[in-house]
């Protein structure tokens, strides 16, 4: 079997073990209610992580996504409650703004050859600051469409349901899979992350691809902000603090190499679900502090980073043997 599948197989094994343990310990864990809640509660994180997957596949990082979610929420609240705009129009404007800001960071990263870490860190601070310029307090988004979005449900067998947030997240994952594996852009992202110099020699448009990667990340984090705002029917400048780290964790647990060039969008989906399952198991237990979620996710990250290192060493050894 190709070694590039090892990380995602490890991800699936961890997910199966955790879910199996949950069903063994708590009979209610097998109810579709839990599955529906997992998909809904982690929808905005997984949408963000899909965009982060493309960034990490290209060999970059985007620390601005959490601040983008908060900014989009505050922007939408201002457009809907302050200017009387329909939420769908506000969402469209927000998506354009998010993609444009991502493109702006991508241009700086690509054209000036600056480390993505420092540029997206600047973007993180900038967007969070702008949130407080717009509004200092939590703002409710009171509109019939938002209420309808929050209340929309598709019944699953048993007691479970799929909400609008979960359905949008699943559509985003499918779209991400198509872009990553069935488009020239997706193949270019993998090539750049695998070996940027070789990609340039092959004539791949490295600069424009990187710009599009950060545009895509900005779009997906803006979409996550829209979903989060609709789901909570409110906006707050301090929303989604630390989500950028959770998104990176979901991508890594999902089997994408931090060095770039190897990974799967579906793996990111499973990584996000694993993080949700851990939170749910701790909630079901009742005797454990919520900080155990961070401890378990940290332990998983240690394991997956070591696995990634072993795989990259194996590939390096095969390349050396081939030469």
Kindly give the residue locations of the regions a language model identified:
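Cytosolic-side transmembrane-helix boundaries in multi-pass membrane proteins
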Residues: 1-20, 24, 174-175, 201-208, ...
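Hydrophobic alpha-helical segments embedded in the membrane of multi-pass proteins
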Residues: 41-51, 67, 71, 100-103, ...
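Single transmembrane alpha-helix segments in multi-pass membrane proteins
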Residues: 18-25, 31-83, 107-114, 251, ...
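Transmembrane helix-bundle core of multi-pass membrane transporters
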Residues: 116-182, 209-212, 232-240, 284-285, ...
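Structural signal for alpha-helical transmembrane segments and their membrane-water exit/capping regions
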Residues: 14-30, 58, 131-135, 177-184
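Transmembrane alpha-helical segments in multi-pass inner-membrane proteins
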Residues: 221, 231-298
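Helix-loop-helix "hairpin" substructures at the membrane interface of multi-pass membrane proteins
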Residues: 86-94, 100-105, 109, 156-235
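Alpha-helical transmembrane segments within multi-pass membrane transporters and channels
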Residues: 84-124, 270-275
């Amino acid at each position: 079997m190709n070694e590039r599948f090892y990380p995602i197989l490890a991800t699936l094994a961890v997910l199966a073990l955790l879910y199996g343990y949950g069903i063994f310990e708590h009979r209610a864990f097998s109810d579709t209610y839990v599955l529906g809640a997992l998909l809904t509660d982690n929808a905005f994180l997984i949408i963000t992580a899909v965009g982060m997957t493309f960034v990490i596949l290209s060999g970059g990082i985007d620390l601005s996504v959490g601040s983008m979610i908060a900014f989009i929420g505050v922007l939408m609240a201002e457009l809907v409650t302050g200017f009387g705009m329909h939420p769908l129009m506000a969402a469209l404007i927000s998506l354009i703004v998010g993609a444009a800001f991502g493109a702006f960071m991508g241009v700086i990263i690509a054209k000036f050859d600056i480390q993505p870490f420092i540029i997206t860190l600047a973007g993180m601070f900038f967007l969070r600051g702008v949130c407080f310029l717009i509004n200092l307090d939590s703002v409710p988004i009171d509109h019939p469409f938002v209420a309808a979005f929050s209340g929309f449900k598709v019944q699953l067998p048993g007691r479970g349901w799929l909400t609008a947030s979960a359905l949008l997240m699943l559509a985003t994952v499918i779209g991400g899979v198509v872009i990553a594996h069935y488009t020239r852009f997706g193949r270019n992202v993998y090539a750049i992350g695998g070996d940027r110099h070789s990609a340039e020699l092959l004539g791949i448009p490295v600069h424009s691809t990187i710009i599009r990667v950060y545009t895509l990340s900005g779009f997906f984090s803006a979409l996550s902000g829209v979903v989060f705002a609709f789901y909570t029917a409110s906006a707050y400048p301090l929303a989604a603090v630390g989500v950028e780290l959770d998104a990176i964790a979901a991508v890594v647990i999902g089997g994408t190499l931090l060095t770039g060039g190897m990974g799967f969008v579906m793996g990111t989906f499973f990584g996000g679900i694993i993080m949700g399952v851990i939170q749910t198991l701790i909630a079901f237990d009742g005797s454990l502090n919520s900080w155990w979620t961070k401890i378990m996710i940290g332990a998983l990250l240690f394991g997956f980073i070591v696995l990634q290192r072993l795989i990259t060493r194996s590939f390096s050894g095969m390349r050396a043997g081939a030469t």
